[in-house]
Amino acid sequence: MKFRFPVVIIDEDFRSENSSGLGIRVLAKAIEVEGFEVLGVTSYGDLTSFAQQQSRASAFILSIDDEEIVEEKPEAIEQLRTFVNEIRYRNEEIPIFLHGETRTSRHIPNDVLRELHGFIHMNEDTPEFVARLIIREAKAYLDSLSPPFFKALTHYAADGSYSLHCPGHSGGVAFLKSPVGQMFHQFFGENMLRADVCNAVDELGQLLDHTGPVAASERNAARIYNCDHLYFVTNGTSTSNKIVWNSTVAPGDIVVVDRNCHKSVLHSIIMTGAIPVFLMPTRNHFGIIGPIPKAEFEWENIKKKIEANPFATDKNAKPRVLTITQSTYDGVLYNVEEIKEMLDGKIDTLHFDEAWLPHATFHDFYGDYHAIGADRPRCKKSMIFSTQSTHKLLAGLSQASQILVQDADSIQLDRDVFNEAYLMHTSTSPQYSIIASCDVAAAMMEAPGGTVLVEESIMEALDFRRAMRKVDEEWGADWWFKVWGPNDLSEEGIEEREAWMLKANERWHGFGNLAEGFNMLDPIKATIITPGLDVDGDFSDEFGIPAAIVTRYLAEHGVIVEKTGLYSFFIMFTIGITKGRWNTMVAALQQFKDDYDKNQPLWKVLPEFAAKFPRYERTGLKDLCAQIHGIYKHNDVARLTTEMYLSNMVPAMKPTDAFAKMAHREIDRVLIDELEGRITAVLLTPYPPGIPLLIPGEQFNAIIVNYLKFAREFNERFPGFETDVHGLVKQVMDGKAMYFVDCVAD
């Protein structure tokens, strides 16, 4: 397949009628005759912005005239040096040629010269020869870009082989036989459909057996991610977590789990028949889940939890796995080296669910606050696993995930045993585009480019925070939005890691007395706080702006956020973020403020929402905010939601046994008013925040029941802003919505 990567020529005379302009255009024409596109420009412009275009080029030709290489006029040399440095900051391999008249390499500073692939003298060799020289280097560069699996897949898709195997669309041909299929084909395109193949294509290797180009790509990714073993997973980190667990946990094993874990970890507990003991995180009244205090990780405290668990028959059994959410949804990180020091050898496997942290290993900013990195010491006895969603913050397609493994000094991964669990959870018909995106996402993070991508994400996140503070200073005398995070930020540049440490009893985070150096906040995760609630859980008597209304407004104005809480919403600065995106966010928030202050009617500012829910048509934006704020305040919802997550969850059955009751239909569908004391057979997960509240086998307490009653009343009063609780069963009886939970039968 031919990719579009033009040769970029930068020459101030490119469009001039002088001899220099004529010469460079003749060279450009010779390159085009050889089949390469040429992009000619007359100046560097914004050096940084232009250098970023290296990702779209196959080579650069930089022109410099004799009169510019003189000591009296160093500007041209300095501009050349700056541009070359900007290119090399991002890309060490792309060919750079210097095009001049009579001066030679001895006239060019050595720090510039050593970065060049060649020096082209005008009017010496023929343009045709020089063009072939440039194209040879450009082709070699382009050939080096594709990682193993992606290269094999593009070759296969371009090869023109007839497929007499599945999938049934046969390279997209089936879609051409139907009008709606034609639409599908035109939307997704020839390449994606030709590359959608099955494991019958031996030349692409096998994901399930880790052979051929697939294996080569996994080895390449392991090198890039600084781990001993790496496995691509095509159906998300939910599956990666289950693979890790099924490879090491059996029925009756004791496991130590972050209570703030993803539901896939709880599913793993149910599937394996494990006996969980939970480490309890902190939580502030904004609804932000904080870190697990360091004391919870102390071995003596873990032993006490095991001894207190009624289902742990062998109180001295060694836990098989520790699973920690790293980072939390809101960006709180743990110092992994301290956890390793505390628990090495005491727990067989230390598993870090890093679905939201695949970028950390590529920048020194994150230090020891991620699981596996370059020059990080091994555990002596415990294996380290990291499960990462490359689709969340890097460039993987949706569901692209990977498992990273670091061997211990005394224990190495048994790849054959591990692969049995991998086979259990991996489709025999994996999506090859996802495999390719895992491959490419890893290759993109190769230094120096990956480091630059992460640094740019951090810088954009910091610039967003600074912009929001600037608006607050200039325009927010009455009210404005806050960005959750440390108060003292510099005006320019990237912050030191120390600035993002969560220090004991600092009011901004609200997590209390935290251990020094144990936690930090990832700056690329930004939680915007709306007015009306403080970190202590006290509601404003004057006014409040619930976040659900703000994010509904943003959505109708083309800005979609990641997560919405009571008075906060969450956005991420991934490697795909742009200045245009976050500046549009700032502008949209300013427009919201203006519409709120004017109390604009919803039919005007939220027309789609008002059309769907006509009861709100004539309601003012400020009035609606006041109504929902009043309900939240009256029910003290911030404290209620905090207390229910921190309340005592009593295990009455093993999770596996309770779930089995549901599978056998040995359940009662219980009204929420009658839930107190009943044992749930299902996961109960309120959104926000999307963290499971109860797991099968635990009993409902009064606080949780009170929250469910509130959710029922709120949903009836404010349709369109419903509190979603997974695990609740809604049934309409006699025109009235009734809510139930499936519980273990009495």
Located regions from the model:
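A short, charged/proline- and glycine-enriched loop
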Residues: 1-7, 55, 227-228, 252, ...
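Conserved acidic segment of CheY-like receiver
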Residues: 3-31, 39-40, 60, 269
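Short acidic, S/G/P-rich loop/turn micro-motifs used as interaction or catalytic elements
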Residues: 13-22, 63-76, 102-105, 328-331
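Non-catalytic terminal extensions of PLP-dependent enzymes
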Residues: 32, 46, 51-59, 70-81, ...
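Conserved PLP-enzyme active-site core in the AAT-like
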Residues: 41-44, 48-53, 85, 109, ...
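Conserved acidic residues
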Residues: 56-59, 114-120, 128, 228, ...
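Hydrophobic/aromatic residues positioned on beta-strands within the core alpha/beta folds
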Residues: 98-99
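Conserved N-terminal alpha-helix of the aminotransferase class I/II PLP-enzyme fold
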Residues: 190-239, 741
